[in-house]
């Protein structure tokens, strides 16, 4: 049957048609090779935006630094980073005037956090620059390595387990004349294989001690490693993102805690909330502006875009903001918070892996590491790369580039939002002292500006005033990329507003489908995504039912688990048919065992195992939920797991799903090839670290998880906990006298071993 496509839209309000404009099918682009070029672009661009600033030299590291603060006022529309200190401070003062007590209260909240946060906060996050090995590592490993090096250099404040004490060690480490570190290296030898008589490369892993003098250590402590941002849609060029080391991370965390606390109290801030809460918050601002403009005023909204937000921000400005925000607070608190911006003013950008060269004629490939770029002959490079290298050379030290201005992506999102909101706040009539006034929304570098005025000239004047005010604090609104419209239709952080925020369901399309973790998790994630979209994104019942059927189909094809009575032949069908025939209650079989699908849109919230439990044959139950099953490398599954879901646009979302541990919750074994590289020692450290943490969690299950306070070690905490639990269990008759005695004996043995060590 032919369908006239216009019929589809007869009953649909125009704003709901947005889901049909979805451009992002297929995989997003990923980067390959080295990010060195992108990082050089960032460094060079950042310096270009601030080129009229003053040059100085860092006395400790010898790095040349450019300071654009209080530089010349811009005379054209080119982006620039010349923020004026007094303007920023005045904007802060006005923000405080219109929100009495906001800074004071946020400081008190943050002070409490500072005193309570433990070092393990820094284990969150994925890749982190590990300064001891000079490359990226998982956060937990990088932290463990840092603490290990600190302790072997006599820095032990961190043993209390408080983050603030770890940061004391960081400060002290910077005063030391030298730091001794252990590095991993690998030796390669050519040996003849006894069996095949061929020559093979044998690798051995070694650890060696290395001393870093003060200058080298400081350079590493101030280094941000760079990578290429992956999976960015809608861009032809890739760009670089930064990952800081452990010395900077803790300080940044406290600054962002303060800024987050301030953002929570600002109605114009799109951070730190998300989803429906964010939509509600923002809709209020729009409603306020529209209500006030109904009778006499015009109201226009700019869907805003800023040029190179990060590269024009300046850590020195953030220092000024923090100094103002914390002005009545205790000295120690002000010091802790001012260290992050100071470190960022002296930061170094690591250029990454360097360049790969290959000679077609000689079949040779060679890597030019970033360290060599300072003095290699430039005749080997093409013209654009040559220009980049020439430009960056004066800034290079040991393969890192001095980068004083600019912020690097994603470092101070909350604090930069506070700066943006402070300019939006200046739009109140009592500040503009004229007929036009403005308000708006800010979320990191994204903004929407709503201007009200009696006539079009007033609107234009308001926009111009906003534009120029932004310039004074280093924010550059892009006139080319911003779009003005009657209030009621605009876009902000990929939310489209048309008389209310429109559910753009198509953005979630990439997250539908089979994730590929394992049979158990995939089923759970799949139905949870459908459930969440019914709640949040106007996914209607008929469409949801169809999505569910498509998902089940997709799932069966992925895991080759078609129903036991199907005609489809796959590698698994022989086994599944056999299971089908010998099962009495066929409805009890999981879909991944060839069973029928019992999900419909009413029961998506129930894990499949629970949904079918009553319908299962007893022996099937016994096989399915058998922790001793030898074929499954079992991980303990919390009742709630987290999956990372990729929408089409914007950051990956963390989504919770229910997980019931069955024999389908397998984890694939780790690839063997890593075991032959210099990573191996690190991998072993990481596994040991993991085991210790898991054991600790056993003693302090999350339900009763009160972290042991005081300066007890993990072992002491676990032993004392074991004794308390054993006594309670013994007195209530849950364990026998012999068992109680045995536990006490083990505890004493552990303590004895610790003393001997």
From Swiss-Prot:
It catalyses: RNA(n) + a ribonucleoside 5'-triphosphate = RNA(n+1) + diphosphate. InterPro entries: RNA-dir_pol_NSvirus, RNA_pol_PB1_influenza. It is found in: Host nucleus; Host cytoplasm. One of its GO terms (biological process) is symbiont-mediated suppression of host gene expression. GO terms for cellular component: host cell cytoplasm; host cell nucleus. Its EC number is 2.7.7.48. Pfam families: Flu_PB1. Residues 249-256 are annotated as: Promoter-binding site. Residues 286-483 form the RdRp catalytic domain. Keywords: Eukaryotic host gene expression shutoff by virus, Eukaryotic host transcription shutoff by virus, Host cytoplasm, Host gene expression shutoff by virus, Host nucleus, Host-virus interaction, Inhibition of host RNA polymerase II by virus, Nucleotide-binding, Nucleotidyltransferase, Phosphoprotein, RNA-directed RNA polymerase, Transferase, Viral RNA replication, Viral transcription. A motif (Nuclear localization signal) lies at residues 187-195, 203-216. Residues 55-64 have a biased composition (Polar residues). Phosphorylated by host PRKCA. Residues 50-82 are annotated as: Disordered. Its main location: host cell. Transmembrane segments: none annotated. It comes from the Viruses. GO terms for molecular function: nucleotide binding; RNA binding; RNA-directed RNA polymerase activity. It is an enzyme of class 2 (transferase). RNA-dependent RNA polymerase which is responsible for replication and transcription of virus RNA segments. The transcription of viral mRNAs occurs by a unique mechanism called cap-snatching. 5' methylated caps of cellular mRNAs are cleaved after 10-13 nucleotides by PA. In turn, these short capped RNAs are used as primers by PB1 for transcription of viral mRNAs. During virus replication, PB1 initiates RNA synthesis and copy vRNA into complementary RNA (cRNA) which in turn serves as a template for the production of more vRNAs. Belongs to the influenza viruses polymerase PB1 family. Influenza RNA polymerase is composed of three subunits: PB1, PB2 and PA. Interacts (via N-terminus) with PA (via C-terminus). Interacts (via C-terminus) with PB2 (via N-terminus); this interaction is essential for transcription initiation. This is RNA-directed RNA polymerase catalytic subunit.
